[in-house]
Amino acid sequence: MTRVKRGIIARKRRQKILNMNKGFRGAASVLFRTANQRYMKSLRSAYENRHNKKRNFRKLWISRLNSAVRLNGLNYSQFVYMLKKSGIILNRKILSQLSICDPQIFHELYSYIASKNLI
């Protein structure tokens, strides 16, 4: 069997990982083994945080809505219940943006819901 020299291939593979780790601190950007571990961990963290971002934004929208609705004397869960009862289909993102950017329209929406549900 003939001998296969993999020097160039192995070097390219290692160099690819090290190039990905530019900007990492300490040995994570210099030593291959440490760099490879940090690179794998960064991919894992990126995957987790892409999914956590959705959760965090939903939490933010709900807390913004809750604070806006409490100014009118309701809480978030009652507000969402009345929205569904009224047949208004607006998601939490749009509602929270309305409450921040255009409070007047948000108040009109609230009064419309209140009149429909007879608070």
UniProtKB/Swiss-Prot annotation:
One biological process term in Gene Ontology: translation
Annotated keywords: Chloroplast, Plastid, Ribonucleoprotein, Ribosomal protein, RNA-binding, rRNA-binding
Compartmental location: Plastid, Chloroplast
SUPFAM superfamilies (UniProt xref): Ribosomal protein L20
Domain of life where this protein originates: Eukaryota
Principal cellular location given in the protein's record: plastid
One of the record's GO cellular component terms: chloroplast
Signal peptide extent: none
Similarity-based family: Belongs to the bacterial ribosomal protein bL20 family.
Protein species of origin: Oedogonium cardiacum
Full protein name: Large ribosomal subunit protein bL20c
Gene3D superfamilies registered for this protein in UniProt: 6.10.160.10, Ribosomal protein L20
Gene name, Swiss-Prot/TrEMBL: rpl20
GO molecular function: rRNA binding; structural constituent of ribosome
Role noted for this protein: Binds directly to 23S ribosomal RNA and is necessary for the in vitro assembly process of the 50S ribosomal subunit. It is not involved in the protein synthesizing functions of that subunit.
